[in-house]
Amino acid sequence: MKFGLFIAFAFPLFALDGVVVNVTTGKPQAGVAINLVQPSQNGMNQLGATTSGAQGDFKIDKQIPPGPGLIQATYQGTTYNMIITPGTPTTGVQVQVYDSTKKAGVAKTLEHLILIEPGPDNIKISETFVLGNESKATFNDPAKGSIQFYLPDSTGGKAQVVITAPGGMPIRRPPVKTPSAGIYKIDYPAIHFLRKGTQ
């Protein structure tokens, strides 16, 4: 019994509540899938899940071990992340989402860099795209992708793709072949950001 009480105090009840706001419309957003996860050595541990209500409200009552948590809000095919660090208020949290669009021109290529590094047996080519999106919408076109690029047949379609959003962690994605010969795409949303960033 004492052991059970000790565990209860060591891992206090973590009540997370707040509202989801659609920045595109400026209104609370209903029907957004909310997941509370925590990073671990074995990946992400899901701690709780819910869906935002009619007024965009959500609440998750869950015990959480010490350390940061991560709110993942999925809306119109895009997942928005918000880190909850120890000591950060967990009530009245505002999670922001955006309407998604396939409209061309919402996300723009600000820079396109190619680095060629010759080696003893091969040539390493690094291609970098810097995207910008200053609209109040997320560019998300799974059919065409956010970026398309060419890979020679000699690569066998093998390329390392790393996506880094402003203030975010690097994310690896496999290139996806399109119907056009040698053309591959990256299916990853271009989320709104005001300052130049990389993706």
What is each model feature region?
Residues 2-13:
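Bacterial N-terminal signal peptides
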Residues 16-199:
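Lumenal/extracellular ectodomains and adaptor appendage modules
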